[in-house]
Amino acid sequence: MVKNSTSIRTRKRVKKQILDGIAHIHASFNNTIVTITDRQGNALGWATSGGSGFRGSRKSTPFAAQVAAERCAEIVKDYGIKNLEVMVKGPGPGRESTIRALNAAGFRITNITDVTPIPHNGCRPPKKRRV
């Protein structure tokens, strides 16, 4: 006997209007991750240099970070964000170009904070490369 299956309706997520957001930029030596959240820290959208089509050593370029920031801005523009607070973490090459790309995407940057973790003589750093 075959049961009649009822169609399951999935509700479309309602995009709420958010005026202020926080852009978290994690710029490592190998990649750049851009995440835009609301004030409470709920992620609205994210993009990476690697996910933007750059592989290998091209992931760690300022241009790849710029493209990732543009993609992230495109994802979250439906939320109506006008102002962004920027939190930059890490020593990577995409720090400055990401902020410039977010500014060019139409966001008003209100605050830039460096939240790079600095050890108080914690773990031993990796040894120097010999090429």
UniProtKB/Swiss-Prot annotation:
Record keywords, A-Z? Ribonucleoprotein, Ribosomal protein, RNA-binding, rRNA-binding
List, alphabetically, the SUPFAM superfamilies matched.
Translational machinery components
For this record, the Gene Ontology CC terms, alphabetical, are:
ribonucleoprotein complex; ribosome
- Report the function annotation for this chain: Located on the platform of the 30S subunit, it bridges several disparate RNA helices of the 16S rRNA. Forms part of the Shine-Dalgarno cleft in the 70S ribosome.
Recite the lineage of the species. Answer: Bacteria, Pseudomonadati, Pseudomonadota, Gammaproteobacteria, Enterobacterales
Per the similarity annotation, which family is this?
Belongs to the universal ribosomal protein uS11 family.
Name used for this protein in its record: Small ribosomal subunit protein uS11
Cystine bridges: none
One Gene Ontology biological process: translation
PROSITE patterns with a match to the protein in the record? RIBOSOMAL_S11
Q: Which domain of life is it from?
A: Bacteria
What's the source species for this entry?
Buchnera aphidicola subsp. Acyrthosiphon pisum (strain APS) (Acyrthosiphon pisum symbiotic bacterium)
| PANTHER family reported in the protein's UniProt record | 40S RIBOSOMAL PROTEIN S14/30S RIBOSOMAL PROTEIN S11 (PTHR11759)
Q: Which InterPro entries match?
A: Ribosomal_uS11, Ribosomal_uS11_bac-type, Ribosomal_uS11_CS, Ribosomal_uS11_sf
